[in-house]
């Protein structure tokens, strides 16, 4: 795969003067972004996966992450409205089913509730989202707005964090089962299911952007969409670290009962 110099990459973009001349250079740039900016590198995740958080801190993470998980189907429905092409809509529709489930079938949101219930959180409180951090709400809503307002190509590109998700799910499953007595295989079922779902989603999105980003400007937009998405994920962990590791919980947010 082509080598791409992204030394000028900023907090918001791949930087001026970076020209991606073909699909191979685009994919190389996307994988570089994931390798350097995906939230598996965040200090909060390192604490979570190594057993360094207490139960209350894990509860705070699961509670806040629920807002992101439960909003994904809304985001994906928004993406579907951007396409006149039936084949693309059919492919994208299964993402909504993966999270919402169907009549008589369990989806990702229900699996996430298994996690929060297993951690001792009241389901009505979790679903109300009244205890989440303001930064969580702002970040997730910004993601939905991005998929609504930017080009369809950028909307699909923003989902490419799924390329890097299986590794963090594997790390999370093994690390949390090893270190925390209050989680088990059933409560971790969301992550186990995503080990097979995420690669399918990522492969479609990667093929789509390789095929449809045909100019250097479009390839840059694809990369910048992925950078935006990594920022959405990263800032949520910044907020969790500030509130529940450093102890600066904002007014009205969830306050753990267990340390």
Swiss-Prot record:
It is an enzyme of class 1 (oxidoreductase). Its EC number is 1.3.3.11. GO terms for molecular function: pyrroloquinoline-quinone synthase activity. InterPro entries: Haem_Oase-like_multi-hlx (IPR016084), PqqC (IPR011845), PqqC-like (IPR039068), Thiaminase-2/PQQC (IPR004305). It catalyses: 6-(2-amino-2-carboxyethyl)-7,8-dioxo-1,2,3,4,7,8-hexahydroquinoline-2,4-dicarboxylate + 3 O2 = pyrroloquinoline quinone + 2 H2O2 + 2 H2O + H(+). Keywords: Oxidoreductase, PQQ biosynthesis. The keyword Oxidoreductase applies. GO terms for biological process: pyrroloquinoline quinone biosynthetic process; sulfur compound metabolic process. Pathway: Cofactor biosynthesis; pyrroloquinoline quinone biosynthesis. Pfam families: TENA_THI-4. SUPFAM superfamilies: Heme oxygenase-like (SSF48613). The keyword Membrane does not apply. Ring cyclization and eight-electron oxidation of 3a-(2-amino-2-carboxyethyl)-4,5-dioxo-4,5,6,7,8,9-hexahydroquinoline-7,9-dicarboxylic-acid to PQQ. Belongs to the PqqC family. HAMAP family: PQQ_syn_PqqC. This is Pyrroloquinoline-quinone synthase. The gene is pqqC.
